[in-house]
Amino acid sequence: MASLVDSNIVVYRCDPRDPDKQRAADELLRAGIVSGTLVLAHQSVVEFFAAVTRPRRDLGGAPLLSADEARIQAELLLAEFRVVYPNRDVVQTALRGTATYGLSWFDAHLWAYAEVYGFEEILSEDFTHGRHYGTVRVVNPFAADGVHELPPLYA
């Protein structure tokens, strides 16, 4: 079973401000590379670059990564993971997701990738852990019960 990975998981891999989440994200992503079970949406790569290059007040105005470092990391993501791209169905499904589930545009867009491409899970800390949106279950890999402890939708 393949899972779609939200940008927040990828950002934590490069964010030393929360060592526990950084370690968990790194372990999860490394395991996903080996197993081939994690997929990134084009949106997650774009959001990753924007998030890690944005100035951070708590870092004295410095970003998590320089633009050059972020570009290298984004290119590695493109090389290491399967990346899915938007099409008409993804956009239409996202538009419906904002109305049906009350999701923000970016969350609805990420969910739409999973729904349209047939992924059973989204790994994210931005949605409600364990909730199903259509055929897609959201799992927060940082939650106490973790990725593999939730029962499948149709067991």
Summary of predicted features, one role per range:
Residues 1-40, 55-69, 145-150, 155:
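Short, well-structured N-terminal submotif of metal-dependent ribonuclease cores
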Residues 6-8, 47, 107, 126:
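Acidic active-site catalytic centers that drive phospho-/nucleotidyl reactions
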Residues 39-43, 123-124:
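Short beta-strand segments at enzyme active-site cores
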Residues 52-87:
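Helix-adjacent hinge/juxtasegments
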Residues 79-123:
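Active-site neighborhoods of divalent-metal-dependent phosphate/nucleic-acid chemistry enzymes
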Residues 111-155:
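Acidic, PIN/NYN-like endoribonuclease modules and their adjacent C-terminal/linker elements
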